[in-house]
Design a protein with these regions (language model features):
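Solvent-exposed loop/turn segments at secondary-structure junctions
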Residues: 61-65, 97-102, 132-136, 157-161, ...
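A domain-start/cap signature at the N-terminus of enzymes
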Residues: 13-55, 136, 140-144, 203-213, ...
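Gly/Ser-rich "nucleophile elbow"/oxyanion-hole loop immediately N-terminal to the catalytic nucleophile
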Residues: 46-51, 100-132
Length: 256
């Protein structure tokens, strides 16, 4: 392994050999407080540090956690590759964390802060997504540091975080899930959507203003059947195909 020349917050990052579809595998952020944080990284060939670029961080589900093996996330997850096709000039990190709770939420925040500092990242265009357990982690990130991100995409998951900090930050959130998700069901996201919507209403936002920053997209059985998918949870890997999803997500920029 070779050390990157950047040392951020007295943290260093090591690069492992190997790549999968242009992602370098098992980069390790040696964080002084959080310990080692593993992630796979795509830096476009066009990147030269002269212009700020967007940053997107994906939090995989259980099948992509680090104990499953280096690069396991890239064997299953579709969103990092869909994002690269959508904007090949974006830096993309697929994190391989250790759980779907507060430990990984803090690790995800530390990784985000490191990458913003290590590369010429546009701080107004930093995006986070979470699938399955990674979605639970992402909802905790939205409780802790929602202002760090331009938008959050939550796929096939349940909401674990507190909503008030998110409502204060007004970070745009897109939730998508199968009506009969085989692992979570859809009630958790329906409730989170309703409660967050109510918080925005209480803050005086109009329906149009809320619609601009909060979406709940519940897919019925026909949506999956048309794609030959029998399981609505695992079928969440097809969500990047949803028309308008990527455009909505990556069009958001932080205000102010």
């Amino acid at each position: 392994m070779t050390l990157l020349t950047a040392f951020i917050m007295t943290a260093s990052c090591a690069l492992a050999e190997g790549a999968v579809r242009d992602f370098t595998l098992d980069n390790i952020l040696h964080h002084p407080e959080r310990g080692d944080i593993h992630f796979n990284l795509y830096v476009p060939d066009s990147y030269d540090d002269s212009q700020p670029v967007p940053l997107y961080i994906a939090l995989p589900g259980w099948e992509g956690l680090y104990f499953q093996g280096v690069g396991a996330d890239l064997e299953w997850e579709t969103m990092p590759f869909a994002a690269r096709e959508y904007d090949p000039d974006m830096i993309i990190a697929s994190a391989q964390l250790n759980d779907w709770g507060m430990t990984s939420a803090l690790d995800a925040i530390a990784l985000t802060e490191y990458l913003i500092s290590a590369y010429n990242v546009d701080p107004n265009r930093v995006y986070l997504s979470g699938y399955s357990g990674g979605g639970e982690t992402g909802s905790l990130v939205m409780e802790l540091r929602p202002e760090l991100y331009a938008a959050y995409l939550m796929m096939a998951s349940q909401w674990d975080g507190e909503l008030e900090p998110l409502a204060e930050a007004r970070t745009p959130v897109y939730m998508i899930i199968g009506e009969d998700d085989s692992y979570y069901g859809s009630e958790s996201l329906k409730n989170a959507f309703a409660n967050l919507h109510a918080l925005y209403e209480a803050k005086g936002l109009s329906d149009a203003e809320i619609d601009d920053i909060l979406i709940l997209n519940v897919k019925d059985a026909d949506w999956f059947a048309r794609r030959g998918i029998s399981d609505q949870h695992g079928g969440g890997m097809a969500f990047p195909e949803e028309p308008g999803l990527l455009e909505w997500f990556f069009s958001k920029t932080k205000k102010g």
